[in-house]
């Protein structure tokens, strides 16, 4: 079943630029949404190349964000 949606000119141009030959706009939207979803395992080991200073900075920044969001760390 088809649905009609309204999009801005900018959104249309962006979708059109992503559209491949023979692909419908529905296909483009589905492909883009699926490709933007990441599996948590894609990030496994990603911090392995960080040095101690970078890790400490990361955790300091996270703590500041948690405090700003009023979340207990």
Curated annotation (Swiss-Prot):
- What keywords are annotated for this sequence in UniProt? Toxin-antitoxin system
Q: Does the keyword Nucleus apply?
A: no
Coiled coil (residue ranges) = none
Would the keyword Chaperone turn up in this protein's UniProt record? no
Kindly give the InterPro entries that the UniProt entry links to this protein: Put_antitoxin
State the HAMAP family in the record: UPF0330
Per the entry, what this protein does is:
Possibly the antitoxin component of a type II toxin-antitoxin (TA) system. Its cognate toxin is VapC21 (Potential).
State the family it belongs to: Belongs to the UPF0330 family.
* Protein name from the UniProt record: Putative antitoxin VapB21
List the source organism.
Sulfurisphaera tokodaii (strain DSM 16993 / JCM 10545 / NBRC 100140 / 7)
Q: Which gene encodes it?
A: vapB21
